[in-house]
Amino acid sequence: MTDRIVPATLVFREDGTVVSPLYGDIYHSAAGALAQADHVFIRGNGLPERWRHERAFTIIETGFGTGCNFLATWAAWRADPSHCERLHFVSVEKHPFAREDLRRAAAHIVAYTTITTITPIAPLVDELANAWPALTPGVHRLEFDDGRITLTLVFGDALDVLPNLALRAHAFYLDGFAPSKNADLWSPAIFKSLAKLADERATFATYTSSGAVKRALDEAGFAYRKVDGFAGKRAMLVGEFAPRWRVRRHEPPRAFSTDRRDAIVIGAGLAGCAVVERLAARGWHVTLIERRERIASEASGNPAGVFHPMIARDDNLAARLSRAGFLHALHRWRALERAGHAFSRSTHGLVQLATSDDEFERMRESIDALGVPAELASALSRDDARALLRTDVAHGGWLFAQGGSISPAALAAAQCAAAGDRLSRIVGVEIARLERGGDGRWRALDASGATIAQASVVVVANAADAARIAGLRHAPTQRVRGQLTLLPPGSAPAVPLPVIGDGYVVPLANGVTLTGATYEPDDTDATPREAGHRENLERLERLLPAFSANALDAGALAGRVGFRCVASDRLPLVGELGDEAAAAREAAALTGARLRDVPRATGLYGAFGYGSRGLVWAALGAELIAAQIDGEPWPLERELAEAIDPARFLVRALRHGRVA
């Protein structure tokens, strides 16, 4: 189980500095947090000059604390007319402040700063606090200044999370509590983890000049030197990554190398449109190819879909992935709405009901054991559920305060609108296969062999057809038929928000109630059937006992059929595809391969196999693909990215000698 997050306690000393009762140390110098950030970390890393020569620049910080190093760096970037196009700031924090404590601490520090040469920071404090995520373990990605500033917060113990990051760092801010107060954050293991993430030209800066820190830096491959410290401190350390021997087996990720930033996305459902928006936001020109005449015509064309995280007592991979996807989706959707790209979604929460009293007890215990914040999920007794839903229920459950329902087609349209003139659409055309030319560019071909489009990068996002088009033999997916049912106004309990459990019920704006859905593997019938409606009505009766399945004529009801694409392990396939032909040639040498050893199909990516969780997973999957293409910090832990890596099935086949 993932360790629960213990928030920091906000305490001020008499001199106005913020202090940690847990570590018995101050977060910043009494001479000023922002001045310290400027002297030690910004100037200590040769900034802003060094980022002027990069399209994107990545900083890692050990210890986010009050956020002042990030705020000072953000302000310095704003003040520099020659700044890099995109600035990535990645910060690890074991004990993050709660939102309002962070706001108070940062606002207090800014109010008492004496710096006058940096862009005003006070307005940035509220932007940061307003975007502050729920205090759950893992990676949280926030964006500011139209996505040009990316803050990737990693909540957890640095010893555990640093080895699980995937990125290439240009600068390190080493800013934990003093080595005498928090020795773990200055241990050799920390610096070895940082060395595995360092760009060849990476620099570092830290306020300490401890002998133990110098030895750990040297052992990890960092060269250091002493310079004048801040506010009368005799010395601090700065330096660069300069290993005298090999310190890592794998190089950190690089950007995809191409002279032309153009891409093809195949499939205009939730998966594909999310990728379109994320690539276009980074300046890529995208051609979207859809076999139907309009976008979101297949499973993504349902009137509504529900979104919520999954909670499991052991906080397994699927639960962690759904939580990360859910929180990231909310962040992206709000950004779309702020940009004027509106779409229909409910904002009053979602209730998940237990199917038995024993299940309810397990649900309640899971919330307590994991320390789940109430803003993410809370236990709901049977009486409270009855009052909230205004109808009878058999058991209690969970309330997901930020869950709800959404129109998938409207979301897809908003994402395409956000892409603007960087998006070209080709509809009514079916791609049969892909081919990479001698010039390194991919061509999308129809059944006759005609080239429909060509680009440097291709993302296959067309569900169950993706593996076939990409020529994958080791990507086991299955079509699962799902039939939903539409109930006329007044024929079902008028619940004020979506309810899930054994099935789901969603109130639509026109008074119609949506319920479903069947789960029928390998059934390709696209026509709604009376038996499917009857199954949905019976499921609704179990979910909401005030409803009678016999009150309606199942044969007279309207509905819709969609097809889920489900992988054999029930996790999506997201990321760069494996080169199966190259793997076959090297099979003998790859029997013990890990994912990072597998040859890749350069420029070919996948986003499919989302099953019933497209709303939860699509935004995060799109961000991961865009980050991989552009060599940016990944928006989730490497362990989670590897769990959904499309090449995972190829690795398993190699280990069992099934690739030839």
Curated annotation (Swiss-Prot):
Pfam families (UniProt xref): DAO (PF01266), Methyltransf_30 (PF05430)
A GO term from the CC aspect: cytoplasm
EC number, UniProt record: 2.1.1.61, 1.5.-.-
Cofactor(s) needed for function: FAD
Xref: InterPro entries: FAD-dep_OxRdtase (IPR006076), FAD/NAD-bd_sf (IPR036188), MnmC-like_methylTransf (IPR008471), SAM-dependent_MTases_sf (IPR029063), tRNA_MAMT_biosynth_bifunc_MnmC (IPR023032), tRNA_MNMC2 (IPR047785), tRNA_S-uridine_synth_MnmC_C (IPR017610)
Gene Ontology MF term list: flavin adenine dinucleotide binding; oxidoreductase activity, acting on the CH-NH group of donors; tRNA (5-methylaminomethyl-2-thiouridylate)(34)-methyltransferase activity
Reactions mediated catalytically: 5-aminomethyl-2-thiouridine(34) in tRNA + S-adenosyl-L-methionine = 5-methylaminomethyl-2-thiouridine(34) in tRNA + S-adenosyl-L-homocysteine + H(+)
Localisation per UniProt entry: Cytoplasm
Region (tRNA (mnm(5)s(2)U34)-methyltransferase) residue spans: 1-242
Ranges where the record places region FAD-dependent cmnm(5)s(2)U34 oxidoreductase: 266-660
Annotated keywords: Cytoplasm, FAD, Flavoprotein, Methyltransferase, Multifunctional enzyme, Oxidoreductase, S-adenosyl-L-methionine, Transferase, tRNA processing
One record GO biological process: methylation
UniProt similarity note: In the N-terminal section; belongs to the methyltransferase superfamily. tRNA (mnm(5)s(2)U34)-methyltransferase family.
Main function: Catalyzes the last two steps in the biosynthesis of 5-methylaminomethyl-2-thiouridine (mnm(5)s(2)U) at the wobble position (U34) in tRNA. Catalyzes the FAD-dependent demodification of cmnm(5)s(2)U34 to nm(5)s(2)U34, followed by the transfer of a methyl group from S-adenosyl-L-methionine to nm(5)s(2)U34, to form mnm(5)s(2)U34.
PANTHER family cross-referenced by the UniProt entry: SARCOSINE DEHYDROGENASE-RELATED, TRNA 5-METHYLAMINOMETHYL-2-THIOURIDINE BIOSYNTHESIS BIFUNCTIONAL PROTEIN MNMC
Protein name in the entry: tRNA 5-methylaminomethyl-2-thiouridine biosynthesis bifunctional protein MnmC
UniProt gene name: mnmC
